From Swiss-Prot:
Species the sequence originates in: Rubrobacter xylanophilus (strain DSM 9941 / JCM 11954 / NBRC 16129 / PRD-1)
Superkingdom in the source lineage: Bacteria
Function: Forms part of the ribosomal stalk, playing a central role in the interaction of the ribosome with GTP-bound translation factors.
Protein name: Large ribosomal subunit protein uL10
Encoding gene, per UniProt annotation: rplJ
Listed GO biological process terms: translation
Length: 174
């Protein structure tokens, strides 16, 4: 590989490392069908699955000013990038459960915190970004809808009471 190509790859990887969370995996022993399936699932989940030389990945991390990933860059290593830290962890952990030779190595959370294998596994069990947003919005909407229900029931009760008073007045006049 020429120097220009290496420099371009390092620059691309550094950009991805700065802008995304990343999960590092050992993909040794995967066949072509398994690799193709993983890439398809990655695209569907919005995860960018990249295989790069360890030396280039190490240089990219240094160029991006990130913590050292040296401990994870031993043997065949692939990187799964995602803006949603949980998405990449969840997908890679699911695949590691399905394929014996595929295993999690570690990760980098939002470009600053190095995660070991157990921490990536724990991250994969959390709800995704969209689910968390939905839970927060639902939590905020619940008290409001409860208030609307109480006010609605109060108004209905008032209308019923006024209707009964009107009937009593009409009965007294008759």
């Amino acid at each position: 590989m020429k120097r220009e190509q290496k420099a371009q790859i390092i620059e691309e990887l550094a950009g991805k490392l700065r802008e995304n969370s990343v999960v590092l995996v050992d993909y040794q022993g995967m066949d072509v069908a398994q690799s193709t399936e993983l890439r398809r699932r990655s695209r569907e989940a919005g995860v960018d699955f990249v295989v790069a030389k360890n030396t280039l990945t190490l240089r990219a991390a240094e160029e991006a000013g990130l913590p050292s990933l040296t401990e994870f860059l031993v043997g065949p290593t692939a990187l799964a990038f995602s803006r949603d830290p949980v998405a990449a962890a969840k997908l890679m952990a699911e695949y590691a459960d399905e394929i014996e030779t595929f295993r999690l190595k570690g990760g980098l959370l939002e470009g600053s915190r190095v995660l070991n294998e157990q921490e990536v596994e724990a991250l994969s069990k959390l709800p995704g970004r969209d689910q968390l947003i939905a839970q927060v919005v639902g939590g905020m909407a619940a008290p409001i809808s409860g208030l609307v229900s109480v006010l609605n029931n109060t108004i209905q009760g008032l209308v019923v009471a006024l209707g009964q008073i009107a009937e009593q007045k009409q009965a007294q006049q008759a």
